[in-house]
């Protein structure tokens, strides 16, 4: 059987004024990805699918984000905000090309899943003209109610127009719909604006379908999945739901979370097996963690690749461009950025390793700094395999430390060090016999010590 073709239209033209932000609403993040990115990721993809995003005027950033996530996305501008049906018809050109299934979603519902989109499409394959997504609301006040007769949806009644009995209905409209693509324009073009706001409401499609003698059905999902984001408080609620999902998925995949509610993950985090994460860890976007790795408490990791059996933290910060080989160790109060640390490297305490490559099995002593910035440009430090860098050393880039080289503690290294060489740079130590006793005596007499 040939797979059904689909067009997903994502409505993302809203101003989001209640967010109190200069950022378009759909570009706010949940689990380190934009609201829009979550919806576009869940939308059908692959052969026979197409995607349209309806944006508002002057929302080029939204168009750019859509194409970043889904290069196949085509954007359309809703010049005037005259209701949801009006927004859908902004993409008339895409609808007119003809598909089996037309899906209509909202760019501010980041919790919707690919599985729900698939369930919503299923009735269309069986002849339904429209399938509407609904949920059982804990508090239905303010939502449109689904009026059903048997298995059929006959109307969506807004709160203001609902009777006393209809207001008792807890099956509410999520706004997401699937419409038979071959009948979509015939339905949408019949929607009028004879209402107090003079707007074109997508919900009117249900009664138009009924008038035509066609079938509309309801597909139920959880209230969490169709949460719309209009305020920063709702954004925080969605974050909480998403984090709970991500934590559960991680643990089901074999990750040990010691205190799950204290760990914050990104939607794109990739875990191997037998990974352990201690309390109060933040994992930002672009992080991949291989088997057996342990992340200790209060570590913050972004755009980083961790090999197998790596140990991180506690109190470590791994910034973008960090890559750690198998068995590498990053200890407490260590920061890395744009750094490749090969297998077995140890940076156990109080160090900054930036714009650097560290060869396998090298040891970087406490307090070591790669001095990568000269006030104008960043420069690279290259440390060979099996090197030993003593504590409190400064490596002034650009500089190369050879394989097996030793750097004495307290050194400021400004020139390349050959393989197996020892480099030591510090002032000669001066010892004055009895000097401490004389100093104390002078201080107690209120006199300055002799030079």
Swiss-Prot record:
Region (Pyrophosphorylase), start-end ranges: 1-232
- Endoplasmic reticulum among the record's keywords? no
Names of the cofactor(s): Mg(2+)
Which GO biological-process labels does this protein carry? cell morphogenesis; cell wall organization; lipid A biosynthetic process; peptidoglycan biosynthetic process; regulation of cell shape; UDP-N-acetylglucosamine biosynthetic process
Extract one GO cellular component term from the record: membrane
Name the keywords, alphabetized.
Acyltransferase, Cell shape, Cell wall biogenesis/degradation, Cytoplasm, Magnesium, Metal-binding, Multifunctional enzyme, Nucleotidyltransferase, Peptidoglycan synthesis, Repeat, Transferase
**Alphabetized InterPro entries for the sequence:** Bifunctional_GlmU, GlmU-like, GlmU_C_LbH, Hexapep, Hexapep_transf_CS, MobA-like_NTP_Trfase, Nucleotide-diphossugar_trans, Trimer_LpxA-like_sf
Name the Pfam families for this protein. Hexapep, NTP_transf_3
Which residues are UDP-N-acetyl-alpha-D-glucosamine-binding? 11-14, 25, 78, 83-84, 144, 158, 173, 230, 319, 337, 352, 363
Task: Tell me the residue numbers annotated for binding acetyl-CoA.
Answer: 366, 372-373, 409, 426
Q: Tell me what reaction this enzyme catalyses.
A: alpha-D-glucosamine 1-phosphate + acetyl-CoA = N-acetyl-alpha-D-glucosamine 1-phosphate + CoA + H(+); N-acetyl-alpha-D-glucosamine 1-phosphate + UTP + H(+) = UDP-N-acetyl-alpha-D-glucosamine + diphosphate
Q: What is the protein's name according to its record?
A: Bifunctional protein GlmU
Source species of the chain: Bradyrhizobium diazoefficiens (strain JCM 10833 / BCRC 13528 / IAM 13628 / NBRC 14792 / USDA 110)
Quick one: which gene encodes this? Answer: glmU
């Amino acid at each position: 059987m040939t797979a059904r073709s689909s067009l997903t239209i994502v409505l993302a033209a809203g101003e989001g004024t209640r967010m109190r932000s200069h950022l378009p609403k759909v570009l706010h993040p949940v689990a380190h990805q934009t609201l829009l990115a979550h919806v576009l990721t869940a939308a059908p993809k692959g052969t026979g699918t197409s995607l349209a995003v309806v944006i508002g005027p002057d929302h080029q950033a939204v168009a750019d984000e859509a194409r970043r996530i889904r290069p196949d996305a085509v954007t359309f501008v809703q010049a005037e905000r005259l209701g949801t049906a009006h927004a859908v018809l902004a993409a008339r050109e895409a609808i007119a090309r003809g598909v089996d299934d037309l899906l209509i979603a909202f760019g501010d519902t980041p919790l919707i899943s690919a599985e729900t989109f698939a369930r919503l499409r299923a009735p269309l394959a069986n002849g339904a003209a429209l399938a509407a997504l609904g949920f059982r609301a804990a508090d239905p006040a303010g939502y449109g109610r689904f009026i059903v007769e048997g298995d059929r949806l006959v109307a969506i009644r807004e709160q203001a127009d609902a009777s006393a009995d209809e207001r008792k209905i807890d099956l509410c409209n999520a706004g997401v719909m699937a419409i038979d693509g071959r009948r979509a324009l015939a339905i949408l073009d019949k929607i009028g604006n004879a209402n107090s706001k003079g707007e074109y409401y997508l919900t009117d499609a249900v009664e138009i379908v009924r008038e035509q003698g066609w079938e509309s059905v309801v597909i139920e999902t959880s209230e969490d999945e169709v949460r719309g984001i209009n305020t920063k408080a709702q954004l925080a609620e969605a974050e909480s739901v998403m984090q709970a999902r991500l934590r559960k998925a991680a643990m089901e995949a074999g990750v040990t979370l010691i205190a799950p509610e204290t760990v914050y993950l990104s939607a794109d985090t990739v875990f191997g097996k037998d990974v352990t994460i201690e309390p109060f860890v933040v994992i930002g976007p672009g992080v991949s963690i291989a088997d057996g790795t342990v992340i200790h408490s209060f570590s913050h990791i972004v755009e980083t690749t961790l090999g197998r059996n790596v140990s991180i933290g506690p109190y470590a910060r791994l910034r973008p461009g960090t890559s750690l080989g198998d068995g590498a160790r990053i200890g407490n109060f260590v920061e890395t950025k744009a750094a490749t640390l090969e297998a077995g490297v140890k940076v156990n305490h109080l160090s900054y390793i930036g714009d650097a490559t560290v060869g396998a099995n090298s040891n970087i002593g406490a307090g070591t700094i790669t001095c990568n910035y000269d006030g104008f440009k960043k420069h690279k430090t290259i440390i060979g395999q099996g090197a030993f860098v003593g504590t409190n050393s400064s490596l002034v880039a650009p500089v190369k430390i050879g394989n097996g080289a030793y750097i004495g503690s307290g050194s400021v290294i400004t020139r390349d060090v050959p393989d197996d060489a020892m480099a030591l740079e510090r002032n000669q130590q001066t010892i004055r016999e009895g000097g401490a006793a004389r100093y104390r005596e002078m201080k107690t007499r209120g006199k300055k010590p002799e030079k």
